[in-house]
């Protein structure tokens, strides 16, 4: 069985690292990795540590954590326990919640010189491929799990991805390793367990080389996806605006398939979950192609797709701030609601606002309804609704833009204009905005 150690060493030799972090679950896969790492550390002087994620889902979770610490002590390796809590009432699958929680707590341990080792093997890859096939995935999903991929500030490696579960268990038994068994692994209500117990045994008995065939298909899908993304990168540069929007005119130039892929690439650019095929079609038909006088929006999970001036935008759902108001004290920062940043009225020679005689009457609102103003350089007052349109403010930002008031009169609208009656050189209004990953 030394061929497994040789395979392991060869895998690690392909990639640069200064430190290795093992994700140690206590199962047979990660226990074999622990044994291989301990041997490699002694032979090559690797800097190795382990992290066990305690999900708290099983009554045996504490015992599993203790088992991992004990096994690490036996080989002289540090082991840290990370505790997570899962929102099991969220409606998401427990498998997905646990996976996301694991990656979330592992990420801070991985810097640019760290290689994170995960224990997935060839049978796991077969299951992942079949689950993607069941969902109707394209090349991205059918690429399944990558052997080597960026993670946090460093990279992750799955050195056993081409090794079968049978070979891993044989190695563990030969070397008298001990491991924990998650009792939930026998519950076929979970999709992966159903495949593991009732589907893949039939497939591997009929086609013994199916694991290798699936791995080849996954690699080909990954290659096709990489080529597609390389091609889309140039197209996206042309389609995306400086504000992060997506040009409808550019989308209209391409085929239906190109349009769909550009929309998906746009979501990826903003680090958002991929929209389904149905959702990309709805984005095009219901938002992009809506009538000119419409104000269309499509809500997808925790984001909305909106249209403004012939572009699509990804924005957080609108928050009703119509009832919010607060006094503004000169020289003091005013925290704004819903993560919109801070406001400060700052004394400044050469500013653009005249300070009123009674600054205690200054206040801030987000409600433009019924208000009028006459920007400096203009003649005659206009409704704020019309002024927002003239200044090119998207509809979803109009009730998230601070309005500085004096009694019942508009002094200025942050980052847009000062009313001519309040033009002066005493001070200026500064809006310190929060920087979100999704454009507003």
UniProtKB/Swiss-Prot annotation:
Q: Which InterPro entries match?
A: Lysidine-tRNA-synth_C, Rossmann-like_a/b/a_fold, TilS/TtcA_N, tRNA_Ile_lys_synt, tRNA_Ile_lys_synt_N, tRNA_Ile_lys_synt_subst-bd
User: Which keywords appear in this protein's UniProt record, sorted alphabetically?
Assistant: ATP-binding, Cytoplasm, Ligase, Nucleotide-binding, tRNA processing
Quote the Gene3D superfamilies the UniProt record gives: 1.20.59.20, HUPs (3.40.50.620)
Which residues participate in ATP binding?
25-30
Q: Where in the cell is it found?
A: Cytoplasm
Q: Which organism is it from?
A: Vibrio cholerae serotype O1 (strain ATCC 39541 / Classical Ogawa 395 / O395)
An annotated Gene Ontology molecular function: ATP binding
Tell me what this protein is called. Answer: tRNA(Ile)-lysidine synthase
Listed EC numbers: 6.3.4.19
The record's Gene Ontology biological-process terms are: tRNA modification
According to its UniProt entry, the function of this protein is described as: Ligates lysine onto the cytidine present at position 34 of the AUA codon-specific tRNA(Ile) that contains the anticodon CAU, in an ATP-dependent manner. Cytidine is converted to lysidine, thus changing the amino acid specificity of the tRNA from methionine to isoleucine.
């Amino acid at each position: 069985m030394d061929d497994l150690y040789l395979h392991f060493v060869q895998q690690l030799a392909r990639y640069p690292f200064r430190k290795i972090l093992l994700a140690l679950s206590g199962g047979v896969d990660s226990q074999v990795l622990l044994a291989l790492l301990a041997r490699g550390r002694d032979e090559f002087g690797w800097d190795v540590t382990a992290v066990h994620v305690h999900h708290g889902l099983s009554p045996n979770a504490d015992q599993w954590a203790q088992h991992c610490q004990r096994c690490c002590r036996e080989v002289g390796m540090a082991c840290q326990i990370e505790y997570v809590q899962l929102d099991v009432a969220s409606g998401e699958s427990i498998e997905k919640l646990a996976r996301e929680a694991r990656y979330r707590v592992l990420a801070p341990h991985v810097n640019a010189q760290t290689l994170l080792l995960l224990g997935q093997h060839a049978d796991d890859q077969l299951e992942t491929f079949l689950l993607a096939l069941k969902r109707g995935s394209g090349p991205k999903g059918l690429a399944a799990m990558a052997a080597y991929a960026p993670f946090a500030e460093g990279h992750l490696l799955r050195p056993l991805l081409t090794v079968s579960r049978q070979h891993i268990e044989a190695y563990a038994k030969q070397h008298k390793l001990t491991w924990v068994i998650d009792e939930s692994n026998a519950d076929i209500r979970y999709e992966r367990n159903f495949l593991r117990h009732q589907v893949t045994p039939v497939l591997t008995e009929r086609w013994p080389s199916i694991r290798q065939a699936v791995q080849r298909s996954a690699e080909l899908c990954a290659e096709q996806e990489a080529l597609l993304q390389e091609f889309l990168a140039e197209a996206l540069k042309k389609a995306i605006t400086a504000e992060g929007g997506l040009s409808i005119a550019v989308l209209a130039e391409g085929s239906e398939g190109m349009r769909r892929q550009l929309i998906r690439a746009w979501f990826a650019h903003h680090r958002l979950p991929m929209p389904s095929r149905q959702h990309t079609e709805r984005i095009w038909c219901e938002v992009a192609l809506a009538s000119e006088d419409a104000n269309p929006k499509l809500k997808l999970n925790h984001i909305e797709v909106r249209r403004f001036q012939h572009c699509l935008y990804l924005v957080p759902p609108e928050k009703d701030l119509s009832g919010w108001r607060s006094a503004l004290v000169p020289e003091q920062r005013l925290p704004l609601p819903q993560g919109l940043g801070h406001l400060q009225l700052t004394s400044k020679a050469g500013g653009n606002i005249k300070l009123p005689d009674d600054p205690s009457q200054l206040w801030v609102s987000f409600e433009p309804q019924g208000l009028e103003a006459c920007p400096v350089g203009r003649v005659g007052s206009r409704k704020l609704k019309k002024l927002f349109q003239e200044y090119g403010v998207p509809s979803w930002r109009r009730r998230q833009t601070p309005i500085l008031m004096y009694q019942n009169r508009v002094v200025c609208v942050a980052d847009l204009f000062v009313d001519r009656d309040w033009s002066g050189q005493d001070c200026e209004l500064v809006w310190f905005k929060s920087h979100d990953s999704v454009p507003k």
